Amino acid sequence: MMRGVLVIMRLLCLGMLFTGCAGVPNSSAPQAIGTVERPVPSNLPKPTPGMDPDVLLREFFKATADPANRHLAARQFLTQSASNAWDDAGRALLIDHVVFVETRGAERVSATMRADILGSLSDMGVFETAEGVLPDPGPVELIKTSGGWRIDRLPNGVFLDWQQFQATYKRNTLYFADPTGKTVVPDPRYVAVLGHDQLATELVSKLLAGPRPEMAHAVRNLLAPPLRLRGPVTRADGSKSGIGRGYGGARIDLEKLSTTDPHSRQLLAAQIIWTLARADIRGPYVINADGAPLDDRFADGWTTSDVAATDPGVADGAGAGLHALVGGALVSLIGQNTTTVLGAFGRMGYQTGAALSRSGRQVASVVTLRRGAPDMAASLWIGDLGGEAVQSADGHSLSRPSWSLDDAVWVVVDTNNVLRAIPEPASGQPARIPVDSAAVASRFPGPITDLQLSRDGTRAAMVIGGQVILAGVEQTQAGQFALTYPRRLGFGLGSSVVSLSWRTGDDIVVTRTDATHPVSYVNLDGVNSDAPARGLQVPLSVIAANPSTVYVAGPQGVLQYSASVAESQQGWSEVAGLTVMGAEPVLPG
């Protein structure tokens, strides 16, 4: 017997990211990832008679990245009995720095596994980052067979090789309707399919299966059961190849449609169209239900223009332009000149945080008196841009406000109490309604120093203890709101986050105390990456963003970064007119 340490491989760092042939056991639960039946891809490893046990283990973990036919590629490395016993269903773990400690004999090898956890992949294709050391899953045992070494015992579940995972899976985004019916909400998924022509069917099937569990009560799914696909998605003319390529379009035939409401049918189409369009499956999109067009106006096919009102990439209130707080008052930027806005928000001093409404026509602003003193007092004011304002909340401290799609303003009072302020229909006076944040407080105790709602209003991103915490926004049957399913994003950011803003519905940008990387991005999966730092001075404070531009408050005033400029010119530049110490950017949201 001999003992040895085998380092399987060092997988890629998460960085810029943006599970003889053994049979499949009948008792194993089905794997929802990659439900398309297809042959094992030729680029995946296969066991060979002369393969050494350490090599076979390494190749097995590569093969687990392909879930097709219930991990058939990986099962080729197992004995029949091991394949019968292996339950590959459920959440898979993505691991890094994998080390096997072997105990080797002539006919049998036993290995224990050590690894770092990078994240997990659910059976719905939901990827979430994580960190920590993999708990001991139990030994992996190999035996020598007539066909070479095979795995005869292994832990249940799937451990994914990150590098092979990247080669096998592609990130796609499903879209569900927000509760107000005004837009669609992203739900990123990782899908493993062989060809482009299978992808459309896979994505529509996932829409029919519904949102991830934590979104189930935060969004609407117009494709919920009993609605189902009548057959695979085809080209608009019914052919099975070239789907969504050129002008061939895509045809989706549904059955058991129950809704007759035109707006609901429009939202149903929007879910399908944005899901396929964002996956580069081009229209026109012929959508039929029970043998007839979903909408007679679009019998020949829908385009993205037909559902433009729900476009998830549109910047809220783009026409309002950039505003800022300068010297405690709200100013607007016109060209390279600033003008103090008319009305209450131009007159009031000591404003410390503000946001324009999603339409850009209203303002919510926090006034803080005796900032930093023991008797500090803060108040929230809401009103029309250029008009008068109404006091809507008060406390010792208030966070920067954030607007929801229903024109409610969310703030954190005294660091822990989340509040919605919304005008009462009868009087027009603001109602102050507490938000249930118990789930957040129990898992992530500590002061909430920033809270910003996603543009669709279904998620809240918070800064707690310098970390980015994401929670769902759910409305209860009683009409109250709650923050649910909180989880941490961006483990690589540590506890350095100061302020955050939603750049898109899937992408958050943050300022940090890290002088080397003072601005970073993090997406809904939890993957973080660093923005360029050229031109920035630290410390940075408030950040505000839209899909095209990121603005930060720094020692020299407000700076901006736009990825749309030439790469040679990319970097942070001063915003003319806002090069004033203490100036803070203000955008809709």
Swiss-Prot record:
<keyword id="KW-0732">Signal</keyword>
<dbReference type="GO" id="GO:0005886">
    <property type="term" value="C:plasma membrane"/>
</dbReference>
<dbReference type="Pfam" id="PF10646">
    <property type="entry name" value="Germane"/>
</dbReference>
<comment type="similarity">
    <text>Belongs to the LpqB lipoprotein family.</text>
</comment>
<keyword id="KW-0564">Palmitate</keyword>
<keyword id="KW-1003">Cell membrane</keyword>
<dbReference type="InterPro" id="IPR018910">
    <property type="entry name" value="Lipoprotein_LpqB_C"/>
</dbReference>
<feature type="lipid moiety-binding region" description="S-diacylglycerol cysteine">
    <location>
        <position position="21"/>
    </location>
</feature>
<keyword id="KW-0472">Membrane</keyword>
<feature type="signal peptide">
    <location>
        <begin position="1"/>
        <end position="20"/>
    </location>
</feature>
<feature type="lipid moiety-binding region" description="N-palmitoyl cysteine">
    <location>
        <position position="21"/>
    </location>
</feature>
<dbReference type="Pfam" id="PF10647">
    <property type="entry name" value="Gmad1"/>
</dbReference>
<protein>
    <recommendedName>
        <fullName>Lipoprotein LpqB</fullName>
    </recommendedName>
</protein>
<dbReference type="InterPro" id="IPR019606">
    <property type="entry name" value="GerMN"/>
</dbReference>
<dbReference type="InterPro" id="IPR023959">
    <property type="entry name" value="Lipoprotein_LpqB"/>
</dbReference>
<keyword id="KW-0449">Lipoprotein</keyword>
